[in-house]
Amino acid sequence: MTSLTIDLLSVLRREPWLYNNWFVTTHRWEVNLTFHLLTSIELWVQMRGIPLLYVCEETALEIAHELGKILTLDFHDSTTTQIAYIRVRIRFGITDRLRFFQRIIFDFGEAALISFQYERLRRICSSCFRMTHHRNSCPYRQIEPLHRVTNSTAQRNVREEVFMRDENLRSSMNSQSQMSESSFPTPIDPPPRIPHPPLNPDELVAAYYPHTRATSLPNFAGPLPQVPLRKNVDERDSNIQPFSGPAFAAHSPRLVEVGESSRQGENTQNVHTVEKGDSSKRKNMGGPRFKDDARKSNEDEHMNGGILKPPKKR
């Protein structure tokens, strides 16, 4: 109740009012006022999604007419600058269902989905889209029939739920539990393998016998035996004897490296080495034992195909 007409009009102009986030309907005081008059509410609605070519007063009025009774249109073709949405004040019945989307086909066959946004709307029934009650107390919602469940059925359902939960947990923790014959398709046969290339005897000889010619060995049809090999070491200050093992054939020609004496055979030993600085008288010393050893070494070199000195010219 208010005594001033200005305040009364201000209250009516600023509705709808809210109490505990629910709409409150208002009506101007009249004599013999009854509750049957409080059956409507006025809301501001924003219409969005109208194509730019059809944004005008005529289009807004035609679309808003489908919602309810139009009270005020807050749009003018000559003065309005914003066209993102059009505001219109509409009177709804308190039991009417609110509409939030509508598909409209225009004259040239262009279709558009128009959305409606209600200002100050806080609560609404998500089942019937009415603004008078909550979903939990909706009288228009169909009540789902309750099935009578016995104790044995309830226990069986609980066991099945526990089993499925454990199975899902086990599957997530161990990916191999999901493998079965129906989980994966049949694998494709692998392509045929390319045969290995034949062995090259020259490369094998170079790897196993670095000081022997490849032509002196037979053609290898399989892998060679693993024989430990050592390189010949011939140094002046070293006492290591050259290796002569079973890998070197007796009839194979012997290779002589640069700086190696041709008189030194495979099975001979270096005796009586002459060091630098010795006198000529000491070189001729040795006795009959030295001569016998020299004669044997010459015979061994002759048998092994060693190089002999040519006779002296007279």
UniProtKB/Swiss-Prot annotation:
Basic and acidic residues bias spans: 289-303
Signal peptide positions (record): none
InterPro entries on file: At4g02000-like, DUF4283, Zn_knuckle_CX2CX4HX4C
Pfam families xrefs: DUF4283, zf-CCHC_4
Pro residues: bias regions: 187-200
Residue ranges of coiled coil: none
Sequence ranges of Polar residues compositional bias: 261-272
Sequence segments annotated as region (Disordered): 170-203, 258-314
Biased composition, class Low complexity, residue ranges: 171-186
Protein name listed in UniProt: Uncharacterized protein At4g02000
Organism: Arabidopsis thaliana
